[in-house]
Amino acid sequence: MSVRAGQDASAVTALVAERWAGLDRLLPVPPALAGGDVLTVPGAAARCGHWAGEPGSLDLAWGAARRFRLEPQVAGPDVRGALDRLLTRWREHLAGLPGTGEDDTAAVVPWPSRDIAGHRALLDHGLIPLAIIAARTAGRDGQAVPSGPGLRIRPAGPADLDSVVALGMETIRYDAHFGTVIERPDSAAALRREVAVRLAGPAPWTWLAERDGSVVGLLYAQRPDQAGWIAPLTRPAPVAYLELMAVRPGARGAGVGAALAAVYHAAADAAGVAVTLLHYEQMNPLSAPFWSQQGYRPLWTDWEARPAAAMR
C-alpha cells in the first residue's frame, strides 16, 4: 500500500480506509477531505481548521480558547516520514495565520491511539499526548468492586442542581492539573446553565451516588441523539458519550465510581448503544486504570502544542 507523489487527497483517503481497518476495528471509515483547507504532501493529506470558543461557554473549560486542528490521513508505507512532511506543511500554514502565538491557543492533532508508527513524528514536532478518547463496546462488563454498605445510586433531578454543579467543578479543578482542562472565572456559571437545562429535560442520563445520605459521586452522559458531534470518531452506531464522572476524594477507592459506571452501562446497553466514548486526561494517574477496569480502551489520542506557535 503506497501513495505516489502528486496523488490527490481522495486517493490517500481510500488507502487510509484500508490501513485503519487493519489497525483498529472501531476506527471509522475516514471521511472525504472535501471543503475547507486541505493540505496534501506525498503519502498524506489532512483537513485543517480553526475553532474559537464563545465567551461564557462551557466549551472553554475543555481546552484553549482558540484551537487550530489538523485531521491527518496517512497511508504509508513510510508513516513517520509522510506525517513529518504533513506537520511541517501545517506549521508553515499556521505561521501565516494571526494569533497562533497567543497564550490561550493550541495546535491539536487527533491520531489513532494504536497507530504507533506516527508517534515519533508527532513528538519531533513538539506535540504531546494530552487527552484520550476511550471506547467501550456494548456488553463489556467492568471489574466488580465491592462498594460497601449504605451506597445508593439514583437518578438526578432539578432539585440536585447544586450537588451536580459542585461535583462537576471538583472534576474541572482536578483535571486542570493535567494540561487540557482550564478552570476559567465563569466556568461554574457556565456549568450551572448547562446542567440546569440537562436536569430539566426528559431522561437526562444523570445519576448521583449517595452514602448515608451524602452525595459522594456523579455520572452524566449524552444519549445518542445528543452525541452526534462525536459519533463520527467510531464505526459502530449508535454512539453515546459519557461526559463526566466525579467521586469526592474521601470516597475514592471504595467502589463508588464502579457502581456509577455499572448503572450507566446497564442503561446504555438497554437503550441499544453500540459504543460509549469518553475523554480522560492522559496524565491523570487515576483515569487510565479505572476506565480500563470498566471495559474502556484508547481509541484516539489528542496531541497538542500550546500555544499553537510552539509547534516545531
Regions found by a protein language model. Give the residues of each.
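Conserved hydrophobic beta-strand within the GNAT/NAT acetyltransferase core sheet
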Residues: A107-V109, L242, T276-Y280
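Acyl-donor-binding surface of acyltransferase catalytic domains
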Residues: A75-G150, W300-A308
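Conserved acetyl-CoA-binding loop-helix of GNAT-fold acetyltransferases
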Residues: D78-G96, L244-V247, G253-A266, Q293
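Short amphipathic alpha-helix that is part of the acyltransferase structural core
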Residues: M1-P30, S147-A188
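Conserved active-site alpha-helix within GNAT-family acetyltransferase domains
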Residues: S113-P129, A258, A270-A271, E281-W300
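Conserved donor-binding loop and adjoining core beta-sheet/short helix segment
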Residues: P28-R89, V216-P238
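A short helix-loop-beta-strand connector motif used in the catalytic cores of GNAT acetyltransferases and
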Residues: P28-A45, R193-W207, P224, Y241, ...
